[in-house]
Amino acid sequence: MFRPKSRQPSEDDLEVFLPEAKRAQLESGWPGVFRREILPMLWEAEADFSDLYHSVIGSPNKPVAELLGILILKEFHDYTDEQALEAVAFNLQWQYGLQLGFSQAYVCQKTLHNFRGRMVKSQKHQRLFHHLTGQIIDRFGL
């Protein structure tokens, strides 16, 4: 079942627990760039994926932006699904980049697999790729 999500800070966000020096290091590296530049684009695309879910039946969806972010970072790092899900659960860089609190830093492998399957079947991944590529080119003047 699709329920639109918005990124609300949680009580266990990394900003609350990380020392300033570590937070600054994350912010200046790829996690900060991903969080500032890419993740907002994914949140904007959230509603475009509502038709991948049943309107009434099923558990509420994991945020689409989160799943898309995991799939993008998985390819960026050339990880398997298993490695990517482990990074979500235990890697501060991934958690910071995806803006996940400690309690949010878990995705079931079946959830990721099923989402990717529905996305590919609907060909939304192609439209998203072209949309994001255009936004990135505009944003960074490439």
Where are these regions (language model features)?
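A general alpha-helix detector
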Residues: E66-I72, T111-F115
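Catalytic micro-motifs at enzyme active sites that drive phosphoryl/nucleotidyl and oxygen chemistry
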Residues: S59, G97-Q104
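Basic, short loop/linker segments at the boundary and entry of helix-turn-helix/winged-helix-like folds
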Residues: E27-G69, F76-H77
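Active-site- or DNA-interface-adjacent structural scaffold in DNA-acting proteins
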Residues: F102-L142
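Charged, often Cys/His-bearing segments associated with DNA-binding zinc-finger transcription factors
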Residues: M1-L42
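Alpha-helix boundary/capping segments in eukaryotic regulatory proteins
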Residues: H77-L85
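DNA-recognition alpha helix
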Residues: A84-Y96, I136
